[in-house]
Amino acid sequence: MKFNNYMILEFPSKSCNEAFARSAVACFASQLDPTLEELGDIRTAVSEAVTNCIVHAYPEELGIITLRCRILKDNVLDIVVKDKGVGIEDIETARKPMFTTGGADRSGMGFTIMESFMTTFHLISAPGKGTTVHMRRKLQRRK
């Protein structure tokens, strides 16, 4: 698929980098002139994806999170968040609302939020090999 512009970031799975990641994506997406609602949805989806990497992919040690964004034709923002952490054993169960392996302080709504805020959402994972979240958002053309 052809793209008009792209960025790739790599950063350690520190909680302080979650805000950096969502802000970087919001700044990158701004070239598409999104509405405030679209920008908020994108920031939230990226926040959930990166937080999952920080909390679940690397529970015992720091690891690397890779974030790739591309501008595709027809005003589509393509986002990939990837880790090489512990992976997900049962993707179907993990995608169910309210399911979490993170304890009582976790809501278990991350994948549900990502799926509802983005136009498309795909999840690929294998135990011991990491997880890739691939999301796209088709943005309105503002007049």
Predicted features, each with a name:
Residues F11, S23, T35, L39, ...:
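Generic hydrophobic-segment detector
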Residues I8-A19:
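STAS-typified acidic loop motif
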Residues N17, E38-V46, E61, C69, ...:
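Generic, well-ordered alpha-helical segments
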Residues S23-S47, R106:
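Conserved short strand/loop->alpha-helix "switch" segment adjacent to the catalytic nucleotide/phosphoryl-transfer site
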Residues E48-N52:
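Conserved polar catalytic motif of the HATPase_c/GHKL fold
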Residues M1-I8, C53-K143:
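Conserved beta-strand-loop-beta-strand hairpin that lines the nucleotide-binding pocket
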